[in-house]
Amino acid sequence: MKIGVYPGSFDPVTNGHLDIIERASKIFDKLIVAVLVNPNKTPVFDIEERVELLKETTEHLPNVEVKAFKGLLIDFMKQENAKVIVKGLRAVSDFEYEFQMALLNKKLEPSIETIFMMTNSKYSYLSSSMVKEVARFGGCIEDLVPEKIAKKVMKKLNKKYTEMEEK
């Protein structure tokens, strides 16, 4: 069985992420969307919320599983018996960092491969940070995040930014 892992913080999941997930799910027998607990970031959505949003977003894809993980990605890969990391690239600017990470993962575990997938050009500008920024200033995010979860994401972001402004 070919198992791929698509890691990220997904805070929140965007249409760009979904584009990569849908396309990668056609390549692998099983694709695990690995939601990272990143100690270097303070997420708006906690790990349970991010996992739940991704499960809702990907429920139409029977070979996709969503799991949380912390620690080294290669340790998670071993635990899941996966050999391929899937990384989405929006632009050339993403490549340098992702290339360095791929080389590091290869050094730590030589059996691990990384494949890079270019996002659809209509999402090349899109990031979770941009979704949060648009929401913060009251803009519409319905075309930026999966339709299924747009209202939940907007509600959470509105609440978060209202609380920040009150402080």
Curated annotation (Swiss-Prot):
Q: Where in the cell is it found?
A: Cytoplasm
Q: Where does ATP bind?
A: 9-10, 17, 88-90, 98, 123-129
A Pfam family of the record is CTP_transf_like
Query: Which cofactor does the UniProt annotation name?
Result: Mg(2+)
Q: According to its UniProt record, in which pathway does this protein act?
A: Cofactor biosynthesis; coenzyme A biosynthesis; CoA from (R)-pantothenate: step 4/5
Q: Which residues bind substrate?
A: 9, 41, 73, 87
Single GO cellular component term = cytoplasm
Under the GO molecular function aspect, what terms does this record hold?
ATP binding; pantetheine-phosphate adenylyltransferase activity
Q: Which residues form a coiled coil?
A: none
Q: What reaction does this enzyme carry out catalytically?
A: (R)-4'-phosphopantetheine + ATP + H(+) = 3'-dephospho-CoA + diphosphate
Where is the site described as Transition state stabilizer found in this chain? Answer: 17
Q: Which InterPro entries match?
A: Cyt_trans-like, PPAT, Rossmann-like_a/b/a_fold
Q: What class of enzyme is it?
A: transferase
> Could you say which EC number(s) this protein's record lists?
2.7.7.3
Q: Which SUPFAM superfamilies match?
A: Nucleotidylyl transferase
Q: Name one GO biological process term.
A: coenzyme A biosynthetic process
Keywords in alphabetical order: ATP-binding, Coenzyme A biosynthesis, Cytoplasm, Magnesium, Nucleotide-binding, Nucleotidyltransferase, Transferase
Its annotated function is as follows: Reversibly transfers an adenylyl group from ATP to 4'-phosphopantetheine, yielding dephospho-CoA (dPCoA) and pyrophosphate.
HAMAP family from the UniProt entry: PPAT_bact
Protein family according to the UniProt entry: Belongs to the bacterial CoaD family.
Subunit structure, interactors included:
Homohexamer.
User: How is this protein named in the record?
Assistant: Phosphopantetheine adenylyltransferase
Per the UniProt record, the source organism is Caldicellulosiruptor bescii (strain ATCC BAA-1888 / DSM 6725 / KCTC 15123 / Z-1320) (Anaerocellum thermophilum)
